């Protein structure tokens, strides 16, 4: 088996494991918030930093493709005036593998004050970001596909797959 094939199989296994580890309550909670967002013609605001930010942009584009008003909000810009785009009826999907990303944790209290629903898509369900959110989607992986276990590979594949699945249902 080639190294490329092995990497693809490991990422596929991580996605399959994620499908098994998501609880029905988590999924139903996220879908209910997204349905409410669509019914109210509100926005889905998606945010993340680094590789999670890149995945967040892709998820926003996918939701826009199916007709839900969705946008990516850079959390740094949010802290410097762009939070004005977020309304109480909106839903915010926050992506972070660690769940401890400082910029997202700084945005969290502002979202709470606005009454904006928060869904955390995190690699650590016991993280600060998870504790500050209304719904937590567990996107944890055992290890990255990268030989050094450093580059976000399996974790970004899982986060993107969960985002795609949310948009597809």
Identify the role of each PLM range:
Residues 35, 43-169:
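Glycine-rich phosphate-binding loops that contact phosphosugars or nucleotide phosphates
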Residues 1-40:
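An N-terminal, well-structured beta->alpha segment
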